[in-house]
Design a protein with these regions (language model features):
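Residue-level recognition of tetratricopeptide repeat
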Residues: 2, 35-36, 154-158
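Alpha-helical segment of the N-proximal tetratricopeptide repeat
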Residues: 2-32
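Short coil/turn linking the two alpha-helices of tandem helical-hairpin repeats
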Residues: 11, 44-55, 100-127, 172-179
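Juxtamembrane boundary at the C-terminal end of a transmembrane helix
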Residues: 238-248
């Protein structure tokens, strides 16, 4: 059928990361099947992917807002009938995986040179994009929580709770960035959320072992700060040893 051919073309385009073609074919599918979750998500996903290389932050915000809206209606169009469970599970897991790949992608940022008492320093507007990313992650969490409530067999929601856990872990990783100072910087809040999800997963699966929260690589500023602190400590130790030797 036309829809099946369009889906095949869209998936091939996505596999090749041809986001313009991906957007085009998923748009065709959505026109014929307005409740098709795959088409709803990936049509806006392709747009958002292209926005990452656009230096205009406001255009990026517009495209990411469309993706956020698409995520928010995943649960509205979710078919909770038992016969669709495995198909839906595979699709939701794929969407989550691709969303996490998007959230961890590089993106164009604008830099500015500013001047202070200690000379010049460079800043960038990456925090605004990270705000957008966190909002996507929160939108995914909300949509998944709504889907969980539609599944009678709670043991079949285990994979959905794991998705929620992954999204909270992503938000926590943003908070740990030294450069991030914006709206979602309360690390304790996200750690508490992760712990609550871990407890839920242990109830559903006694063999569940929570994944370690990966430490982010240290930034250049963090490394420089550690080196500077180490030098100061070494100098203090040397001075103490010197004064002790002089007093003997």
């Amino acid at each position: 059928s036309f829809v099946e051919r369009s889906l095949e073309n869209a998936r091939r385009a996505k596999a090749k990361e041809d986001w313009e073609e991906c957007e085009k074919y998923y748009n065709m599918v959505e026109q014929y099947e307005p409740t098709n979750i795959e088409a709803i998500f990936y049509f806006s996903y392709g747009k958002a992917r292209m926005a990452l290389v656009d230096s205009d932050r406001f255009k990026r915000e517009q495209k990411i807002k469309v993706l956020k809206n698409s995520i928010s209606v995943i649960d509205d169009n979710y078919d909770s009938s038992p016969k669709k469970y495995e198909e839906n599970k595979a699709l939701i897991q794929r969407i989550n995986s691709d969303l996490l790949a998007f959230l961890n992608s590089s993106f164009v940022m604008n830099t500015t040179t500013e001047y202070g008492k200690n000379g010049s320093y460079t800043t960038n507007d990456s925090e605004y994009t990270y705000d957008m990313f966190v909002e996507l992650s929160l939108g995914m969490i909300e949509s998944i929580e709504h889907i969980i409530h539609t599944i009678p067999d709670k043991y079949k929601t285990t994979y959905l709770w794991k998705i929620i856990r992954q999204q909270y872990a992503y938000i926590y990783s943003v908070c740990r960035k030294t450069s991030y100072r914006h709206n979602y910087k309360n690390k304790r809040q996200w750690l508490d959320s992760i712990n609550r999800v871990d407890e839920k997963l242990k109830q559903l699966d006694p063999n569940y072992l929570e994944a370690d929260l990966e430490e982010l690589p240290r930034t250049t500023n963090e490394v420089n700060a550690i080196i500077a602190a180490a030098i100061v400590i070494i100098m203090i130790i040397v001075l103490v040893i010197y004064y002790i030797s002089q007093s003997m």
